[in-house]
A protein has these predicted regions:
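Nucleic-acid endonuclease domains
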Residues: 1-34, 43-169
Length: 169
């Protein structure tokens, strides 16, 4: 699935690309994009349709599900090789994707993706200047916090704090 985000970024930037087969071999890559002397890791999220449209038009709140981009803290040791930082992308999947998932296969919705949102990027310093967290930002209408499955650095694409600003690379 991540390769879809990679292709979208390559096409957007007008750079040629050759896809590597290190996914199946579980090999760690040396970065997904080498551009203007910098190396980037491209992160792609599969986002249910109802959230994807809000992500697309920028109306998603940071406390909503899929409102933040995440970089897992357990991969922090890889960050040093991504000299340009992280690029965040998203593809749309059906709202009922969990109900229709068949183990060991690729969903038709992913095979038939027609668009990818290039959300923005975060520099190394954006990641390292923040503390990782187990929790999503608090919803002001709810007393409970949503817990992630792992410790993460989180970024909201339009929080005005310089995180994943979506400006040119």
């Amino acid at each position: 699935m991540g390769v879809l985000g990679e292709i979208a970024v390559y096409k957007y930037l007008g750079v040629s690309y050759e896809l590597t087969d290190n996914y199946e071999a579980n090999q760690v890559d040396e970065g997904d994009l080498h551009y203007k002397g910098l190396i980037y890791d491209i992160k792609t999220d599969a986002v249910p349709r109802s959230y994807y449209s809000k992500l697309y038009d920028g109306s998603i709140s940071n406390y909503e599900k899929y409102g933040c981009r995440v970089f897992t803290a357990k991969h922090l040791h890889h960050l040093k090789k991504y000299t340009g930082g992280l690029i965040f992308t998203a593809i749309e999947i059906p709202d009922n994707a969990k109900l229709t998932k068949v183990e060991g296969t690729i969903r038709d919705a992913i095979l038939n993706v027609k668009s990818v949102i290039i959300i923005g990027y975060a520099k190394q310093s954006d990641v390292t200047s923040h503390e990782p967290t187990w929790y999503a930002p608090k919803d002001p209408k709810s007393p409970s916090l949503i817990k992630y499955n792992s410790l993460n650095y989180i970024f909201h694409h339009c929080d005005g704090q310089g995180h994943a600003p979506g400006s040119s690379i």
